[in-house]
């Protein structure tokens, strides 16, 4: 049963608060959820959900707006889990749209946080990379969990992260709070481009069978390949995702991919020239 909730735009407005650039928006939350659901290990809400609300859970009294905000995030988690399990071809990330341009950066930042929460379990997916090579951005909490700078940071730490190419830039970066309505529809095809080098590359040697995209048209491939690719007896085989990447660095990476039937599936793709 769906919990009482608010719309995604309402959630984004509440999270925006006073408009500071370090707020976490719905698109970043959706990236976090995607990594949590698609990851090789179970990560309980008690671990990942506080990252959405600045490191601690709000006082969600029954019937309160805080309860509905939490419910909205949990409902999206359940929806993504259901889609990636039962209908991965129908999963679409929640990206932001600004003046007709699809902005993927905040989603990738959230996805990168999800990677860091998975820790050692992501090492097999990273090919020959050691688990220590995967990004663990931010500070360590008392419980040993990484507190992601984009989700819960003071002003000094945000500025420190922003000035270093080895950390993920604050998700707003003068643009996050100016974005328009949230969309979950596949965006129109655009030409991907790269502005800075990428610090993280996950090599995956599996992709979807051709029939999963037989309906045609532009699409954003589901990140479920990261999860289902670990199962030896499933229907994911054959092709490959070349570079599945959570974008690190500055400025925001803006791109979409269009998948033709039978083509390699690519999500947040950066290529080395």
Curated annotation (Swiss-Prot):
Disulfide bonds: none
Biased composition (Low complexity): 183-192
InterPro entries the record matches: YgfB-like, YgfB-like_sf
Biased composition (Basic residues): 164-179
Record-annotated membrane-spanning stretches: 24-44, 103-123
Pfam family, one: UPF0149
GO CC annotation: plasma membrane
Record key words, sorted: Cell membrane, Membrane, Plasmid, Transmembrane, Transmembrane helix
Keyword Metal-binding annotated: no
Topological category with respect to the lipid bilayer: Multi-pass membrane protein
The keyword Cell wall biogenesis/degradation is annotated on this UniProt entry: no
Region (Disordered): 132-194
Name the record gives this protein: Uncharacterized protein y4jE
Native species: Sinorhizobium fredii (strain NBRC 101917 / NGR234)
């Amino acid at each position: 049963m769906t919990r009482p909730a608010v719309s995604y735009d309402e959630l984004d407005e509440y999270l925006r608060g006073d408009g500071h650039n370090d707020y976490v928006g719905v698109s970043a939350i959706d990236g976090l959820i995607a990594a949590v659901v698609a990851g090789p290990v179970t990560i309980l809400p008690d671990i990942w959900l506080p990252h959405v609300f600045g490191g601690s859970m709000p006082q969600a009294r029954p019937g309160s707006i805080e309860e509905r905000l939490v419910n909205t995030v949990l409902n999206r988690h359940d929806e993504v889990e259901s889609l990636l399990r039962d209908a991965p071809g129908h999963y679409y990330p929640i990206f932001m749209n600004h003046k007709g341009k699809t902005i993927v950066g905040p989603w990738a930042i959230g996805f990168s946080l999800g990677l860091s929460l998975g820790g050692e379990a992501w090492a097999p997916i990273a090919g020959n990379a050691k688990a220590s090579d995967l990004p663990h951005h931010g500070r360590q909490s008392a419980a040993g969990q990484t507190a992601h700078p984009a989700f819960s940071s003071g002003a000094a730490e945000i500025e420190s992260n922003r000035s270093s190419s080895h950390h993920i830039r604050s998700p707003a970066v003068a643009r996050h709070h100016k974005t328009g309505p949230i969309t979950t529809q596949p965006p129109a095809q655009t030409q991907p481009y790269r502005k800075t080098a990428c610090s993280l590359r996950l090599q995956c040697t599996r992709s979807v069978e051709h029939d999963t995209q037989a309906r045609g048209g532009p699409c954003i491939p589901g990140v479920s390949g990261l999860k289902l690719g670990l199962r030896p007896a499933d229907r994911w085989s054959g092709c490959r995702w070349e570079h599945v990447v959570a974008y690190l660095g500055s400025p925001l990476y803006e791109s979409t991919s269009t998948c033709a039937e039978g083509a390699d599936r690519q999500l947040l793709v950066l290529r080395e020239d």
